[in-house]
């Protein structure tokens, strides 16, 4: 009996790892496509949320549990830090992941309604990488220029991101 439980647990962990890896692949592919184009850069969180939604919902079906949701929410923010981005992304990713876990758990990981609401909050995990555009504006653009992006890119992003755009993101 104990061996059967371990096998089921191992399958769940493998499935969770697979879906987290698929989510990261979607994140990286969309990031590579969007990063050089200012308007796509600003749409990146929404594009990742849209294209990763089937992966998220399948993950909840095949590997229900808090750890897969939380790790999938936090790992991209750690990836951003590791690649030289401003390190405040986890300040948004951790609460977004925790809220997503609580909402999915409320529906016992089986309710489409609660899983969809959970995905909505989960998708905020990437917003931490964009928050500096508004709260650390000068530092963000200086850091972005030093990171190799063009002045034209920075000027376009600056023009497209007045304060009133923050709640729309």
Regions found by a protein language model. Give the residues of each.
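Membrane-interfacial segments
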Residues: 30-38, 63, 67, 87, ...
């Amino acid at each position: 009996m104990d061996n059967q439980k371990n096998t089921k647990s191992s399958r769940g962990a493998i499935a969770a790892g697979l879906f987290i890896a698929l989510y990261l692949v979607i994140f990286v592919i969309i990031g590579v496509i969007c990063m050089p184009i200012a308007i796509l850069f600003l749409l990146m969180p929404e594009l990742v949320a849209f294209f990763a939604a089937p992966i998220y919902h399948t993950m909840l079906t095949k590997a229900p549990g808090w750890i897969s949701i939380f790790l999938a929410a936090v790992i991209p923010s750690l990836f951003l830090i590791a690649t030289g981005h401003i390190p405040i992304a986890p300040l948004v990713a951790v609460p977004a992941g925790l809220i997503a876990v609580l909402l999915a758990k409320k529906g016992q990981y089986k309710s489409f309604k609660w899983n969809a609401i959970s995905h909505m909050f989960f998708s905020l995990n990437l917003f931490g990488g964009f928050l500096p555009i508004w709260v650390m504006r000068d530092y963000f653009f200086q850091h972005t220029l030093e990171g190799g992006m063009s002045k034209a890119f920075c000027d376009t992003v600056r023009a497209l991101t007045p304060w009133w755009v923050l709640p729309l993101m």
